[in-house]
Structures are given as C-alpha cells and as structure tokens.
C-alpha cells in the first residue's frame, strides 16, 4: 500500500483485528465497509473511536481494518486494541497517554468452559429435596 503506513494487531475474546494507519482525513474502513455500515450499534462505534479521540487524531489518519472472529463487542474491542498498537508505532510518545486510559493492555478475559455435570460453566442443575 503506502510507504508511510503503520500496523497494529488487536485481540479481544475470540476476535482478531489487523489495523493499518496512514495519514489522511479520518476515513475508517472495516472489512471493505464504512464504520457506520459495519457497526450498527453506537456503543461499538464509540469504542472504535476512543483511542483516536484521546490523542486528537480523528481527522488526521485513515484506517484500513480487517477483523475476524467473535461478535460485535469482541470485534470492537479488538479494533480498539489494534488502533492503539498502531498509534504507538506511529508515535511512541502517545504510549503513556494511551496506557493511562487503559487501551494498551489486552483484556485477557475469556469465556469460561462448560463443565461436565453442570448446565453452564458454573450453573448447577436445579436441586430437588424430594
């Protein structure tokens, strides 16, 4: 693509996002669709924009993103993590600000597995006294 582009990989739950950043005018493309087309929920769009708004670069950078796996919330979180990593590659001085906001740390929470003899991960079958 361009010679001055920056890359970041983001992960959250079972989603993985590859984020490419280059100087531009604020266009965000996710899986060949615009941010508004890809995420119907306003909260997901807000999560994606958070790192850019924090460092005031919403209108200065173009983002090209491919994201796979998981659901809407997981994908939004993965994109946010990827954007954060790409921004740090773009300008290392942004790291402390992004870390303070909590965007640098990967959210390691995963779905707990279902156990044998239980209905879900922790939900036990109903107990009947008699």
Swiss-Prot record:
Pull one GO CC term from this UniProt entry.
Answer: cytosolic small ribosomal subunit
Q: Which InterPro entries match?
A: Ribosomal_Su5_D2-typ_SF, Ribosomal_uS9, Ribosomal_uS9_bac/plastid, Ribosomal_uS9_CS, Ribsml_uS5_D2-typ_fold_subgr
- Biological processes per GO annotation: translation
Keyword Metal-binding: yes or no?
A: no
Q: Tell me which family the UniProt entry assigns to this protein.
A: Belongs to the universal ribosomal protein uS9 family.
The record's listing under NCBIfam families reads: PRK00132.1
Q: What is this protein called?
A: Small ribosomal subunit protein uS9
The species this protein was found in: Shigella dysenteriae serotype 1 (strain Sd197)
Question: What are the leading ranks of the lineage?
Answer: Bacteria, Pseudomonadati, Pseudomonadota, Gammaproteobacteria, Enterobacterales
């Amino acid at each position: 693509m361009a010679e001055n582009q920056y890359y970041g990989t983001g992960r959250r739950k079972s989603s993985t996002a590859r984020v490419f950043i280059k100087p531009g005018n604020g266009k965000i493309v996710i899986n060949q669709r615009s941010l508004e087309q890809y995420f119907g929920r306003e909260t997901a769009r807000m999560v994606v924009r958070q790192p850019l708004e924090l460092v005031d670069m919403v209108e200065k950078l173009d983002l090209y993103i491919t994201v796979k796996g998981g659901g809407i919330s997981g994908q939004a979180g993965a994109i946010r993590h990827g954007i954060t990593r790409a921004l740090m590659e773009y300008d290392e001085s942004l790291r402390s600000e992004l870390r303070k906001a909590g965007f640098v740390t990967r959210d390691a929470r995963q779905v707990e597995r279902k156990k044998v003899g239980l209905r879900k991960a922790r939900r036990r079958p109903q107990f009947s006294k008699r």
